[in-house]
A protein has these predicted regions:
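Solvent-exposed loop/turn segments at secondary-structure junctions
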Residues: 22-23, 49-52, 101, 110, ...
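Phosphate-handling active-site elements
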Residues: 27-41, 317
Length: 384
């Protein structure tokens, strides 16, 4: 799949957002014959952080009757806010708030260096969470708790404006050679893309620690309180490869995530289990398989990238794959990473594909009632 330009998430955990937007920009570039362009990651990130703050505060209200050492309450206070995420965040935010070109809301120091901002907002959210629990324990009615939460979100909004800038409500833009028009973020998205990100895409997982050909849902794994939890079909790796190859052959990029730190040769941009011989060096073996690594929290989905190419042998079987990364053009192989099929088997976890590339038998699995997994499941890991 052809691409134009490499993006750079800088010192932030926004790979999930860059990846989702890179998938969408490739569609827009192809559709309108555009040169290199980007959507504003900062615009989407602003509302992502605001919605996550609301998700946390409402979660605190919902669990206010439980003790502080309840596992869900503990999990909430350990995860008030992060800059990481998944494809659910891409769909949750864009479906509600739309998109803008990067020129309409550029990056800031804090959007490119999210650590301090996220820590400060997270600290404030924990303080607010305690206040909401105290109010609920004192018998404050739900309608009054909602008012308190809304006021708290006003504080978060101000913190986000100070660090990321205020989101644009309207802007003027045109295609090259076209007449400039005024858009809202939602009207811009609907006119130029308009994809139903919630219903037109299928989230696929390769998790050998769970039963295959089942639908799973991870609780609280979403970016909006009224959004959709990460709900996926768990498939054998060969099934996922067939879907990915069909998409690439049709020049359609995919959201893809993996455990990128394993056996990465960053200078060559190569992911291969044979890159390093740790067993000879240490005089021992490392025998856990993929299932065991998942069960022991030794491996999981840590980074999202855009799956864009595959090298097939004469029999049509994959030999290696290529992804567009978001670490800048100087990283890896001209901003890309290449992975052997052997590495793909061991460290690939998630692919998000358009429904038209997914067999009917897999789509039928989505009709099952999902098996609900807790928020602290090994497969709930923000991609950063």
């Amino acid at each position: 799949v052809l691409s134009k330009g490499i993006t750079d998430q800088q010192s932030s955990g926004r790979c999930w957002l860059f990846t989702g937007l890179n998938v969408l920009r490739s569609q827009m570039i192809a559709k309108y014959g555009l040169d290199e362009m980007e959507f504003s990651q900062n615009y989407c990130f602003f509302y992502d952080q605001l919605e996550k703050a609301n998700l946390f505060l409402q979660g605190i209200i919902d669990t206010s009757g439980k003790p502080m050492d309840d596992k869900m309450v503990e999990w909430l206070f350990k995860h008030p806010l992060s800059d990481g995420g998944q494809f659910t965040g891409v769909s949750d935010i864009i479906e509600k708030y739309g998109l803008v070109p990067k020129s309409a809301m550029v990056e800031t120091f804090s959007s490119e260096n999210t650590g301090k901002m996220s820590n400060l907002i997270g600290l404030k959210l924990k303080e607010f969470g305690l206040q909401l629990r105290e109010a609920a324990a004192a018998g404050v009615k739900p309608v009054e708790l909602e008012k308190k939460k809304t006021k708290m979100l006003g504080t978060v909004y101000r913190m986000l404006v100070l660090t990321l800038g205020e989101p644009v409500s309207t802007f003027t833009w045109s295609l090259k050679g076209g007449e400039a028009k005024e858009y809202t973020p939602v009207s811009f998205y609907k006119e130029f893309l308009g994809n139903d990100l919630t219903n037109n895409y299928v989230m696929l997982m390769n998790d050998p620690s769970r039963e295959f050909y089942k639908c799973y849902e991870i609780d609280f794994d979403r970016h909006r309180y009224d959004g959709k939890n990460w709900t996926y079909v768990n498939l054998p790796i060969e099934d996922i490869k067939e879907i990915a190859i069909a998409s690439i052959k049709d020049s359609t990029m995919m959201y893809f995530s993996c455990d990128v730190g394993k056996f990465l040769d960053s200078k060559r941009g190569l992911l291969d289990p044979d890159n390093y011989d740790y067993e000879s060096l240490m005089g021992t073996t490392f025998g856990m398989d993929k299932k065991q690594r998942i069960q022991t929290f030794s491996s999981g989905s840590s980074h999202a990238m855009t799956l864009m190419a595959v090298d097939l042998d004469k029999a049509g079987k994959p030999k290696k794959w290529m992804v567009e990364n978001s670490w800048g053009s100087a990283s890896g192989y001209r901003g890309h990473l290449i992975m052997t099929d052997k590495w793909f088997d061991e460290y690939m976890f998630r692919v998000v594909a358009e429904k038209k590339y997914v067999p009917a038998k897999v789509l039928d699995i989505l009709k099952q009632k999902p098996i609900r997994l807790p928020a602290w499941d090994p497969m709930f890991a923000d991609e950063e």
